[in-house]
Amino acid sequence: KFAESYPSQLSVSTEQRMVIGRAFAMNPDLLLMDEPYGQMDIKMRFYLEDEVIRLWKETGTTVIFITHNIEEAVYLAQKVLILTNKPAKVKERLSIDLPHPRNVSGSEFIRIRKYVTDQIKWW
């Protein structure tokens, strides 16, 4: 559908889908994703999170996902590194042993999200 389109003709969400797909298509051993969803609407964000999980499972690529969004981290990750404030150091390594797709309203998901939130409070 978008094969003949120029980047300027694509919506932000479509362009981001293409970028993520292209990154996985290169079959890298390691993929670094630094806040890839930016100001994307929540519906597209949920869709892309599930696509990243699907592609990660299909390819076996190690994905390092950088985010300030706690719910996103708990939804996507097998391991979360909780950092301290400046200067940033690893405060805790947390394993998340929940099956995908994760239920964001499930009690265990909420418990983990709350725990991570409590660990990063420095006020």
What is the predicted function of each stretch?
Residues 1-8:
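Conserved ABC nucleotide-binding domain
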Residues 86-113:
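Conserved beta-strand-loop-alpha-helix hinge in the C-terminal portion
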Residues 27:
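Conserved catalytic motifs of ABC-family nucleotide-binding domains
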Residues 60-66:
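Conserved H-loop
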Residues 31-34:
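Catalytic Walker B motif of ABC-type/P-loop ATPase nucleotide-binding domains
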Residues 45-59:
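Helical segment within the ABC ATPase nucleotide-binding domain
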Residues 11-17:
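ABC ATPase nucleotide-binding domain "signature motif"
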